[in-house]
């Protein structure tokens, strides 16, 4: 039976952008990681905070048995702030990997891939891009951030082969001034598959522009409680059945575009 919960060891933790932390974890759970886009459910090291925090997996190394997560912290009363205070060598209670990730098996070398990410929705797209790199397909990656202060993973994406990378910031402090949707308007090729994760407004814009695309994969960000589909705290509307609720933690977080009513 797969291992789904473990006291993982924190290898390192550092602030990589304004209020955004990178944590490297080590443990046996890494062996279960295969699909990019899945998430971990972390217990907060504070007995008064009962709910776990869902954080997407940015990348992993099965040889080293390590995985990397990036997350944004809240104020001093938040669970993520408590997690950010943990030091190297500490243990943290982790469930995962949970949810359904991005499918990559169907991708072939002739495919033209578009990846669109915004803010803290960018991290799960990095492992996706790493796996697509092995397919030798052409990737265009569009990333949007509020400002240069919160820009993450640019170097990591840029080092991948067959990648065209463009960045937009809302305030114009880096790259193109404006939202990432403006970069989509510059796409002049037929997209074979599109993968996206970010804020609801961005996802809605992507879904509208590419609603006819069969291979449109959308990763939803949502507040969660149980993380395993039991509590219905993270539901989205099903486009094909208005009486059916899609659970982000169990049915997602990755959905086909045609499934979601955004």
Swiss-Prot record:
Any idea where the FAD-binding FR-type domain is? 3-104
Write out the residues that bind FAD.
53-56, 70-72, 79-80
* Gene Ontology BP term (one): 'de novo' UMP biosynthetic process
Pathway as given in its UniProt record: Pyrimidine metabolism; UMP biosynthesis via de novo pathway; orotate from (S)-dihydroorotate (NAD(+) route): step 1/1
**What keywords appear on the UniProt entry?**
2Fe-2S, Electron transport, FAD, Flavoprotein, Iron, Iron-sulfur, Metal-binding, Pyrimidine biosynthesis, Transport
User: What transmembrane ranges does the database entry give?
Assistant: none
- Sorted alphabetically, which Gene3D superfamilies does this protein's record hold? Dihydroorotate dehydrogenase, electron transfer subunit (2.10.240.10), Nucleotide-binding domain of ferredoxin-NADP reductase (FNR) module (3.40.50.80), Translation factors (2.40.30.10)
Residues bound to [2Fe-2S] cluster? 226, 231, 234, 249
Record's InterPro entries?
Cyt_c3_hydrogenase_gsu, Dihydroorotate_DH_ele_sf, Dihydroorotate_DH_Fe-S-bd, Dihydroorotate_DHASE_ETsu, FAD-bd_FR_type, FNR_nucleotide-bd, OxRdtase_FAD/NAD-bd, PyrK_electron_transfer
Cofactor entry: [2Fe-2S] cluster; FAD
Cross-referenced Pfam families, in alphabetical order?
DHODB_Fe-S_bind (PF10418), NAD_binding_1 (PF00175)
Gene Ontology MF, one: flavin adenine dinucleotide binding
Q: Does Nucleotide-binding show up as a keyword for this record?
A: no
Keyword presence, Glycoprotein = no
Domain of life here? Bacteria
How is the cofactor bound here? Binds 1 [2Fe-2S] cluster per subunit. Binds 1 FAD per subunit.
Record-linked HAMAP family: DHODB_Fe_S_bind
PANTHER family cross-referenced by the UniProt entry: DIHYDROOROTATE DEHYDROGENASE B (NAD(+)), ELECTRON TRANSFER SUBUNIT, DIHYDROOROTATE DEHYDROGENASE B (NAD(+)), ELECTRON TRANSFER SUBUNIT-RELATED
Cited function:
Responsible for channeling the electrons from the oxidation of dihydroorotate from the FMN redox center in the PyrD type B subunit to the ultimate electron acceptor NAD(+).
- Tell me which family the UniProt entry assigns to this protein: Belongs to the PyrK family.
Q: How does it assemble?
A: Heterotetramer of 2 PyrK and 2 PyrD type B subunits.
Q: What is this protein called?
A: Dihydroorotate dehydrogenase B (NAD(+)), electron transfer subunit
The organism of origin for this protein? Lactococcus lactis subsp. lactis (strain IL1403) (Streptococcus lactis)
């Amino acid at each position: 039976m797969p291992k789904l919960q473990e006291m993982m060891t924190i290898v390192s933790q550092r602030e990589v952008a304004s209020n955004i932390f990178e944590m490297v974890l080590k443990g046996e759970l890494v062996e279960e990681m295969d699909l990019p886009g899945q998430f971990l459910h972390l217990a907060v090291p504070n007995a008064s905070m009962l709910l776990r925090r869902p954080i997407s997996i940015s990348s992993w190394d099965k040889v080293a048995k390590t995985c990397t997560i990036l997350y944004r912290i809240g104020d001093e009363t938040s669970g993520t702030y408590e997690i950010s205070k943990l030091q190297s060598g500490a243990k943290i209670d982790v469930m995962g990997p949970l949810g359904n990730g991005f499918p990559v098996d169907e991708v072939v070398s002739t495919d033209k891939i578009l990846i669109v990410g915004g803010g803290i929705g960018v991290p799960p797209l990095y492992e996706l891009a790493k796996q697509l790199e092995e397919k030798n397909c052409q990737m265009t990656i569009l990333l949007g951030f509020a400002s240069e202060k919160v820009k993450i993973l640019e170097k990591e994406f840029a080092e991948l082969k067959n990648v065209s990378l463009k960045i937009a910031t809302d305030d114009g402090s880096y790259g193109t001034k404006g939202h990432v949707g403006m970069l989509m308007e510059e796409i002049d090729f037929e997209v074979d598959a599109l993968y996206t994760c970010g804020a609801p407004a961005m996802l809605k814009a992507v879904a509208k522009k590419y609603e006819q695309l069969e291979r449109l994969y959308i990763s939803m960000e949502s507040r969660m409680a149980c993380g395993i589909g039991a509590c219905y705290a993270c539901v989205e509307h099903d486009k094909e059945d208005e009486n059916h609720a899609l659970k982000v933690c169990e049915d997602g977080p990755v959905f086909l575009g045609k499934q979601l009513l955004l």
